[in-house]
């Protein structure tokens, strides 16, 4: 009964967003370097991919590198950028084989031209896949996204701006509103992540660090979500 209910619930979630938090603290806990913690966090994506595919949730967004993360040490920033490149290189074929469409959102012009090309190649290769969309938020900040959207609208010559105008000017206009936002790591905030898209999202926080997160934790979050009544401001 519980298994049947679980998969019934899953069909109601169109967009799952995850803040992959706690990699550095996990590393400290295990006497490892921050780089080893971030690598463990990236490896967790690979581990959870089968579960993401089984969930049958059309759109999943992972917060991997925020606009504020640029302020960290150059060593840590360089490693995180390198990690994205390595992930795309080693995982792209498997993602493509499993029908995953890749999207990457953020201020990508801050990245090297070679990494931008690698990102564009991954997007182009998988653009016709339709099993799930895996969106990687990298060099991403939601306030910056909204500012960039407004700048785009102003540049187009519009004098009045609607919700629809902003939606169509976002980094990914096709991104559905977030239904469930999960944040591991024991921190209770959303950290400038998908503020526009998560306006009515249900929030789920876990004390577990991201590298310790597993498919049962994902399922627990979804089951918790299923017990909530979403009113969207109505009664």
UniProtKB/Swiss-Prot annotation:
Homodimer. Substrate binds at residues 22-26, 34, 38, 66-68, 70, 72, 183, 189-191. Mg(2+) binds at residues 21, 202. NCBIfam families: uppS. Keywords: Magnesium, Metal-binding, Transferase. The lineage of its organism: Bacteria, Pseudomonadati, Pseudomonadota, Alphaproteobacteria, Rickettsiales. Its cofactor is Mg(2+). It comes from the Bacteria. It holds the Pfam family Prenyltransf. GO terms for molecular function: ditrans,polycis-polyprenyl diphosphate synthase [(2E,6E)-farnesyl diphosphate specific] activity; magnesium ion binding. Catalyzes the condensation of isopentenyl diphosphate (IPP) with allylic pyrophosphates generating different type of terpenoids. SUPFAM superfamilies: Undecaprenyl diphosphate synthase. This is Isoprenyl transferase. Binds 2 magnesium ions per subunit. The active site is at 21, 69 (proton acceptor).
């Amino acid at each position: 009964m519980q298994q049947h209910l679980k998969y019934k619930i899953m069909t109601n979630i169109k967009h799952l967003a995850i803040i992959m938090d706690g990699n550095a603290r996990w590393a400290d806990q295990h006497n490892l370097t921050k780089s080893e913690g971030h690598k463990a966090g990236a490896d967790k994506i690979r581990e959870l991919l089968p579960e993401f595919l089984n969930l049958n949730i059309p759109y999943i967004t992972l917060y991997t590198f925020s606009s504020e993360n640029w302020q960290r040490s150059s060593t840590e920033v360089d490693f995180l950028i390198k990690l994205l490149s390595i992930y795309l290189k080693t995982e792209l074929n498997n993602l493509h084989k499993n029908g995953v469409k890749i999207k990457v959102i953020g201020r990508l012009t801050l990245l090297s031209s070679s990494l931008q090309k690698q990102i564009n190649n991954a997007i182009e290769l998988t653009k016709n896949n339709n099993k799930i969309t895996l969106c990687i938020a990298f060099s991403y900040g939601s306030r910056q996204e909204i500012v960039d959207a407004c700048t785009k609208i102003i540049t187009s010559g519009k004098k009045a701006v609607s919700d629809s105008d902003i939606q169509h000017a976002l980094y990914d206009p096709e991104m559905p509103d977030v239904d469930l936002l999960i944040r591991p790591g024991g921190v209770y905030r959303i950290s400038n992540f998908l503020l526009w898209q998560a306006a009515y999202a249900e929030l789920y926080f876990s004390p577990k660090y991201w590298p310790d997160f597993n498919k049962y934790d994902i399922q627990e979050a979804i089951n918790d979500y299923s017990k909530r009544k979403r009113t969207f401001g109505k009664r």
